[in-house]
Amino acid sequence: MQVYSGKSVFGGIAIGKISVYRKNEQQLKRVRTEDTKGELARYEAAKAAAIEQLQELYQKALKEVGEANAAIFEIHQMMLDDGDYNESVENIIETQKINAEYAVAVTGDNFAQMFRAMDDDYMRERAADVKDISERVLSILNGGQKGKVITDEPVIIVADDLAPSETVQLEKDMVLSFVTVHGSVNSHTAILARTMAIPALIGTEELPLDDTVDGKLAVVDGLNGKEE
């Protein structure tokens, strides 16, 4: 029997099959273009669509986890409207004459690194938020939807990490628990887990995310921070 340890976000015991959640891989290429106006227009359209999605998530979260917890999706909308973020994307498109996808990815990485370097714990957590909004815009630019956990039976979700948008879209009746390799007890995802009363562990760094665990029966001990 394998035992993996992590930090408990919400106490409780869960027993069930593991479902490994793999995020949609973004196909990112650096493509030169002379049509910078067209790329700027694509970015603006994708950003508008992302803000609309975030508003829908806010309304869903408002009903299910309350105004205080739903506020993260308002924060995400504000981050997408942030002047510095948008100026960075637009500047990269115009000066480097490249596609919108690449500009968004570079901007997201740069801003995430900036937040991670800050001394304040709360501000460091914003690195995950800026990556989340950037991935949402990238998904739209690539013609898809941002990842969503889908299952037809109650399972223990195991993932590298879960964004707040992915967490709030979990169908509580279908999720016995979730376990992530990375994450922080101060993250919005952890806060949402507590509010949704889902037993959860984070920081289970030795847990594999492959077929060796997918579909296997497991026990999540949210009281002692262990998965067996």
Range-by-range predicted roles:
Residues 1-228:
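Non-catalytic, soluble scaffold/interaction modules
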